[in-house]
Amino acid sequence: MITMNAIQWPKKWIPGETDNFVSNEVIVKGLDFNKVVQHLRDASHWEKYYKNSGNVHMFETFGFLVEAQVEEFELKDTILRLAWRGWNEAKGDEYLEIYHAWIVEKLDNDRVRILTQESQSGVPAKALAKSVPNAMLNGHQAWLDGLVAYSR
């Protein structure tokens, strides 16, 4: 039996306790772990493979302008843990706050696992949670697919 790593959630962001949560994951054979890590950790690459991103310290995502701050960065030989908190400057019903976490993990048999999960709070998060098709779920899958293709 094999156990894979999991996101380490701060208490405020525990999935199911916020207004919106999505999880996307791929496991790909023959992908270079170091390329994936480089293309994810360096935000200047993002627009080359993910159309729903822009700017570095502040970015627009799903129609919201969000400031961002890295909350976790840990790179070891076989795993990258990366997470950031984002928020907008709006008040009341327009306020949105997010915690977006990633794991890139080198697995046996020449496989790489990429896991991304996002937990959100605020009225906009509630609306995103109800969207059909789910814009955040599909957007993050496009991010994963783009990251994989760009890293090949």
Per-region residue spans from a language model:
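Residue-level detector of alpha-helix boundaries and kinks
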Residues: 21, 30-31, 89, 128-132
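Acidic, low-complexity intrinsically disordered regions
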Residues: 5, 9, 42, 80-83, ...
